[in-house]
Design a protein with these regions (language model features):
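A short loop-to-beta-strand scaffold at the N-terminal edge of the catalytic core in hydrolase folds
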Residues: 62-63, 70-86
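Alpha/beta-hydrolase active-site loop
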Residues: 132-159
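Conserved alpha/beta-hydrolase
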Residues: 112-130
Length: 344
């Protein structure tokens, strides 16, 4: 049976004992208010129609180029943007981000169209996290830029404040949304966000540090904190170091920490509701990391359940690893109810 955890129950995420959550942020300056983008955005260019190969049925597709992101201005990246129109009266726009490197289309089986939502699916041509020498936070300018473009594009959301503008991401896709909120000011445009199994990049310095605690308690279950080897390339970790190394130099740990979603960003989103859905059974690090991001938001927002909630799922709910079981249908209903205009 699933459980919903609000700030008043944050202790339950560490219920096995009094030890502090190893993923909790110890930097009191790492909370803030909903302000303009902390990091600059790039530009969407070269917009043109393309065939919808592999896109959800009924989509029309455009390929775009994201360029000009600070720190990686000479490293443009293309994405395919697939759009499925709403059925009936239009209620808003939902932007979807897939896990891993973001190649492919996430969330088409949720069928939000039937509830009146235009669906926009982002598929990167290569891993959005990958840069020549920077880290994931710098690369996260790319999804934030494309999110801002969808919001303002006249043929898409057209900057409407009478319709909901919302996001949904799975695993690494929830990381795209997490960075957009925490480090790129997207709390100023997003009304509602579903974070499904993630985000995984809340504390890279803990997830990649072989000397850090290997597990953390989430909803009474000890789940892994260890991030996968894909972080080696995405975070440009130089050999002989790797994600999972022990005796990591302090300067490298500091870089990993600085590149994390949960450090040094904005975590108070007074006009954005964020809901998290995580599986505790045979979980990957996305469960611990997603719970840590939720805790950071909840603390910044005073535990307001209208702004942030964390939904736990267990083996009895049919979840396993990053798959949510009954949580997927709960997430669908939460978005349908929560994707309403809040920035009016």
């Amino acid at each position: 049976m699933r459980s919903i955890y609000l700030l008043a129950l944050v202790a339950c995420s560490n219920s096995s004992g009094p030890a502090p959550d190893p993923v909790a942020d110890d930097d009191p300056a790492a909370v803030g208010v909903d302000v303009a983008a902390l990091s600059g955005l790039g530009t969407v260019t070269n917009v043109h129609a393309v065939a919808c190969n592999g896109a959800p049925m009924g989509s029309t597709c455009r390929q775009v180029t994201v360029t000009g992101c600070p720190g990686i201005a000479s490293e443009p990246l293309d994405a395919v943007v697939a759009v499925r129109p709403a059925m009936g009266t239009l209620r808003g726009t939902v932007v979807h981000f897939k896990g891993g490197g973001g190649e492919g289309f996430q969330g088409s089986d949720q069928n939000y169209e039937a509830a009146g939502f235009r669906n926009v699916y982002i598929s990167w041509l290569t891993d959005w996290e990958q840069t020549q020498s920077a880290g994931i936070k710098t690369a996260a300018c790319r999804p934030a830029t494309i999110l801002q473009w969808v919001f303002t594009e006249p043929t898409l959301h057209n900057s409407s404040r009478t319709l909901g503008f919302c996001g949904e991401g799975f695993s690494g896709g929830s990381g795209q949304l997490g960075y957009a909120l925490a480090h790129y000011g997207m709390g100023s445009v997003l009304d509602y966000v579903n974070e499904l199994s993630g985000p995984p990049f809340t504390r890279i310095d803990i997830g990649c540090n072989g000397d850090a605690p290997p597990t953390s308690m989430v909803c009474g279950v000890a789940d892994t904190t260890r991030l996968p080897s894909s972080l080696n390339a995405w975070e440009n970790i130089q050999s002989p170091l790797k994600c999972g190394s022990t005796s990591v130099p302090p300067s490298e740990l500091a870089r990993w920490k600085s590149d994390s979603i949960g450090v040094g960003g904005v975590y108070n989103y007074p006009k954005t509701q964020v809901q998290f859905f995580g599986c505790t059974f045979q979980a990957t690090a996305v469960t611990v990391m997603g719970n840590a991001y939720f805790n950071t938001i909840s603390q910044a927002e005073g535990g307001n359940p209208n702004l942030a909630q964390y939904h736990c799922y267990f083996q009895s709910d049919g979840c396993q690893g990053e798959q949510l079981g009954t949580g997927l249908s709960d997430a669908k209903q939460a978005l349908i109810a929560g994707c309403v205009p809040r920035h009016q």
